[in-house]
């Protein structure tokens, strides 16, 4: 991705690390004890060779088909100084996905500030009109697994202990949100679903195979 000055895989898995090395991909081994991906990213970002970077991006491993445009849009939220932390979301137009706990939903303010992330359906739809009828007025949003941080915000995030809401929802972004850190959300075009279940793994393998990507299983 040309939007990045440098990309590296951060992992605590020797299997993943060995595969990356065989493909010529930069990789950094980390502690196996991190409570979240952001904590893992912070460990690597604090190493001497990465301390010169002022904006750090975290592309999560369960978003293998993330588009470059989504990465760029997220980084731009932080790079222009508007937000300490940035992330992105895509319109959610399926009633089934709206109630699926593996699909993370979010609500944001008119200025783009994240109000809450949840596995539950937010905002709650009191009547039974199809979601698609309400998209233009107030879209339902699916969170896409990428973050950008200023170095200071990244350090502030990982200095916090895992929060009650973070533990309840198993969503790391609730930790800084609960502590008052401002998270900006940009809305992007359609994004491929993330990988959260074994069915998702099989679906993704089929899709990658159709694109000519070899299997490393």
For the regions a protein language model found, what residue spans apply to each?
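Short, acidic, metal-binding catalytic loop of nucleotide-sugar glycosyltransferases
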Residues: 1-4
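Conserved beta-strand segments of alpha/beta enzyme cores
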Residues: 6, 26, 113, 182-184
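Short phosphate-binding loop-to-helix
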Residues: 8, 14-59, 63-73
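Structured catalytic cores of enzymes that bind and process phosphorylated ligands/cofactors
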Residues: 11-12, 53, 74, 83-88, ...
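Conserved core of the sugar-phosphate nucleotidyltransferase
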Residues: 67-163
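Conserved alpha/beta core of the MobA/IspD/sugar-nucleotide pyrophosphorylase nucleotidyltransferase superfamily
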Residues: 131-217
